[in-house]
Structures are given as structure tokens and as C-alpha cells.
Amino acid sequence: MLTSGVILLNGGLLSPNPGLIFWTTVSFVIVLLILRKLAWGPIISALEEREKGIQSSIDRAHKAKDEAEEILRKNRELLAKADAESDKIIREGKEYGEKLRAGIAEKAQAEAAKMISMAKEEIEQEKRRALDVLRNEVAELAVMGAEKIIKTSLDADMQKKIVDSMIQDLSTKRN
């Protein structure tokens, strides 16, 4: 009964009734046995299959992770080897370039030294030729000048002595 929104309980649902408790328990046990016979096996096997599937997925994930770590380790090793190889190639290239540069510089220096030596030798030869020409001209001028001064003819030995003396005087004055 309902009076002003409150339920009056006179031997209703909340009072314990031993017969109701007995039959409820018996019904529960019977339903439990039926469920155990019919549904428990499939439920347990489904749960076990699910557990096996999950465990299999976990195992595959661990295996994939281990394989990925192994591949990563190998890649790092390969990268380290490639870095070392590239460093070696760069170092060898630099050494080769340095040797090549040094060889070219050495060859250029040798070529320049050879050219300078040849130029000096050529200059020295030209200097000797010019001095020889100059000596001859000076000797001739000196002889002509001496002949005019003394108005007499000199013999060849005397001319040679006078010319040699003048050349030596000129050489000592120049140096």
C-alpha cells in the first residue's frame, strides 16, 4: 500500500520468509547447475581461447620488438661502419690532394728555379759578350786616341800593353 509516498511493509518483501529463502536458494542452485552444464564450458573455453590469443599477440609483439631491436642494432653497426669508411675515404682524399698539391708546388718551384738559372746564365753570357765588345771598342778608341796624341805609330806589342793596362784600369774602377 501506498500512503503519502511511503510503502507500508506488513509482511511484504523485506520480512524474511523461510520458505521463500529455501525455494530461492534451490532455484539459484538449479540455474547455476544448468548454466554450469550448458554455458560454463563454452564461456571458460572462450575465455581460455581469448587468453591464448592475447598471449600469442603479446609473444608476437615481444618477438617483433626483439627483431626490431636487432635490426636497429645492425643498422647502427652498418651506419658506424659507413661513417668510418666515409671518414677514411675523406682522409685519403685529403692526403692525396695534399700530396698532389705538394708535388705540383715542388714541380713549379723546380721549373721556376730552372728558368731563373737559365735566365741568369743567359744574362751572364750577354754580359760577357757586351764586356768583350766594350773592351774591343775601348781598345780601338784608346789606340786611336793615343795615336792622335802622340802622332806616331806604335808597334803591335806596345798597343796591346797599353790596351790591357787601360782595360784593367777600367775593370778596377767599375768593381
UniProtKB/Swiss-Prot annotation:
UniProt keyword list: ATP synthesis, Cell inner membrane, Cell membrane, CF(0), Hydrogen ion transport, Ion transport, Membrane, Transmembrane, Transmembrane helix, Transport
Keyword Transport on entry: yes
- Indicate where this protein is primarily found: membrane
State the compartments where it is located. Answer: Cell inner membrane
Please give an example of a GO cellular component term from this record: proton-transporting ATP synthase complex
Pfam name, any one: ATP-synt_B
Membrane topology note = Single-pass membrane protein
Q: TM segments? A: 14-34
For molecular function, the Gene Ontology terms on record are: proton-transporting ATP synthase activity, rotational mechanism; proton-transporting ATPase activity, rotational mechanism
Q: Which HAMAP family match?
A: ATP_synth_b_bprime
Q: What does this protein do?
A: F(1)F(0) ATP synthase produces ATP from ADP in the presence of a proton or sodium gradient. F-type ATPases consist of two structural domains, F(1) containing the extramembraneous catalytic core and F(0) containing the membrane proton channel, linked together by a central stalk and a peripheral stalk. During catalysis, ATP synthesis in the catalytic domain of F(1) is coupled via a rotary mechanism of the central stalk subunits to proton translocation.
Q: How does it assemble?
A: F-type ATPases have 2 components, F(1) - the catalytic core - and F(0) - the membrane proton channel. F(1) has five subunits: alpha(3), beta(3), gamma(1), delta(1), epsilon(1). F(0) has four main subunits: a(1), b(2) and c(10-14). The alpha and beta chains form an alternating ring which encloses part of the gamma chain. F(1) is attached to F(0) by a central stalk formed by the gamma and epsilon chains, while a peripheral stalk is formed by the delta and b chains.
PANTHER family (UniProt xref): ATP SYNTHASE SUBUNIT B, ATP SYNTHASE SUBUNIT B', CHLOROPLASTIC
Family, as annotated: Belongs to the ATPase B chain family.
- Name recorded for this polypeptide: ATP synthase subunit b
